[in-house]
From Swiss-Prot:
EC number(s) on file: 4.2.1.-, 4.2.1.8
Enzyme class, UniProt record, top EC level: lyase
Record SMART domains: MR_MLE (SM00922)
GO-annotated molecular function: magnesium ion binding; mannonate dehydratase activity
Entry protein name: D-galactonate dehydratase family member Mmwyl1_0037
Origin: domain of life: Bacteria
Keyword annotations of the record: Lyase, Magnesium, Metal-binding
Binding site for substrate: N37, H122, E263, R284, H313, D317, E340
Source taxonomy: Bacteria, Pseudomonadati, Pseudomonadota, Gammaproteobacteria, Oceanospirillales
Family according to the record: Belongs to the mandelate racemase/muconate lactonizing enzyme family. GalD subfamily.
PROSITE patterns (alphabetical): MR_MLE_1 (PS00908)
Reaction(s) the record says it catalyses: D-mannonate = 2-dehydro-3-deoxy-D-gluconate + H2O
Gene3D superfamilies registered for this protein in UniProt: Enolase-like C-terminal domain, Enolase-like, N-terminal domain
Location of the active site: Y159 (proton donor/acceptor), H213 (proton donor/acceptor)
Amino acid sequence: MKIRSAKVIVTCPGRNLVTLKIETDEGVYGIGDATLNGREKSVVSYLEDHVIPTLIGKDPQRVEDIWQYLYRGAYWRRGPVGMTAIAAVDVALWDIKAKLAGMPLYQLLGGKSREKVMVYGHATGLDIESCLEEVRKHVELGYKAVRVQCGIPGIPTTYGVSKEAGKPYEPADSALPAEHVWSTEKYLNNVPELFAAVRKEFGEDLHILHDVHHRLTPIQAARLGKEVEKFHLFWLEDCTAVENQSSYELIRKHTTTPLAIGEVFNSLSDCQELIQNQLIDYIRATITHAGGITNIRRIADFASVFHVKTGFHGATDLSPVCMGAALHFDTWVPNFGIQEHMPHTKETDLVFPHAYEFNDGFFTPGDVPGHGVDIDEEIAAKYPYKPAYLPVNRLEDGTLWNW
């Protein structure tokens, strides 16, 4: 069996999504997610110009060998564009391999470690009261865990908060990057009130998560983690940038609030120190940006040695193809923690028919051979690419800051 063809499909049924489709000479095909939010065309070019020509004629069942070929052979290793492209190939090949075996992907990985996968949803609001209403909607749907974000008085835009009530949060929404304003002081003074309100309204049984989105310095993050210990958060996510992984030592020394990070990581090297020194509790890497199933399995296996659990990124900047693959991985991986979930648009679900199902706060991946997600190319063609870039942040004095 050999790879006969491969092509990239770009569609925008709500936001830009990139899919790689690989077909064998026996007619079996697999698909992988190649979406890199705000940089989609960079991955398209990398795949079409540098990856696809090298795949033709290769044995699709040699998944590890092809992964090594694309990683080691490129010389310019790692980086979000290259690793997203490799991930797309890798997931498509695992999809093919599972289809050839006639089994769902989780079975090929080693079988079930659990019957269902706990997910957390996103509740946002322009203020605390409106955020509580969104939390209530999630609880009524059966969610056991909810990420909470709300507007901060005095800041016109806040990460994770929709511009309009009831609308999904989509940060990449303009032809050029929008400029947002940020105040660490206002944020730190306000956000504990949100957690207090959620606990008062919903009690201790609901898991509360929160994303700081790299906005704090280590000492500021330590202060926040210490102040919110009494609210028993499931985790505090991305509280500071970690180009210097050892910065988490300071945070860890000052708080017992569980820490999660990693959605921007694309290799074990990005998080090795964080994991082996037990500076985090959850690794947030994603299959699509961390080199696919082959590579994220290495990260998860390493993390398990140090009692670090998975908590994979799963927002709508990734397609249902990634969600399907992630749910199969989550069903297998022994050190599973939780899976992020944001519902895609109805149009997206039509483009990507899938076998996974939600019920009472949990997902099951389905039992069809492969990862259980397909793409309807005719419907995809109805939604052409639209330029959209992620915002940038400035402090109130005009200094550029982490978005």
